[in-house]
A protein has these predicted regions:
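Extracellular and organelle-lumenal recognition/adhesion modules and their flexible linkers in secreted
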Residues: 1-190
């Protein structure tokens, strides 16, 4: 699948992904972060760096009454953005992403943002959250809508990045965790 994705053969890659699962695959895979990450498919992806030089330490961590969550520790060093992403096979239309997050001692001027970006056509940002700031260790919900335009191509990227791109170069400090993600097609307004 890695080769198919790298060469832009998204339909073939996604077809192979679905065939391997032998069951209905949701629009957003592993949104609860409870399953181990599946490399090279349409699950969560991140760039691994040696622990001693990493600006981001990312793992799945067990949390009481939640199961596993996506746990991210910022070390103060620079890092590659996006921090984590999932390729979404989404036809044109409007969608809603919902999730929960908790941030503790997060030192960031503008916070973190989830965005959806087209991979072809204009490569436009289809939607983005406001900056997610420190919550003092309390879980809070977030949501945003995005619209996939017809020229977006078959795949878009849901990705986490600093709301201010410069902060990837400067580095961040603190801890953030994510859980309970869902992606649904938004109903037209009446």
């Amino acid at each position: 699948m890695r080769t198919l994705k790298a060469s832009g053969q998204w339909l073939d890659a996604y077809g192979l992904w679905v065939a391997q699962h032998k069951e209905l695959v949701p629009l957003l895979y592993n949104g609860s972060f409870d399953d181990p990450f599946e490399a090279d498919g349409f699950d969560w992806e991140f760039t691994a760096a040696p622990r001693s030089r990493a600006g981001v330490l990312l793992e799945q961590e067990a949390v009481a009454r939640r199961g596993l969550v996506l746990d991210i520790e910022f070390t103060g060093r620079s890092f590659t953005s996006p921090i984590v992403r999932q390729y979404l096979f989404t036809p044109p239309g409007t969608y809603r992403v919902r999730g929960e997050y908790m941030a503790s001692k997060l030192r960031s001027d503008e916070g973190l943002a989830w965005s959806v970006q087209c991979l072809s056509g204009s490569k436009a940002v289809a939607g983005r959250t406001a900056g997610l700031q420190d919550t003092g260790g309390v879980w809070k919900p977030f949501e945003f809508e995005f619209t996939v335009p017809p020229d977006c191509g078959p795949v878009a990227s849901l990705q986490l990045e600093p709301a201010a791109a410069l902060e990837a170069t400067i580095g961040l400090k603190g801890h953030v965790a994510f859980d309970a993600f869902s992606l649904t097609r938004a109903l037209p307004s009446q």
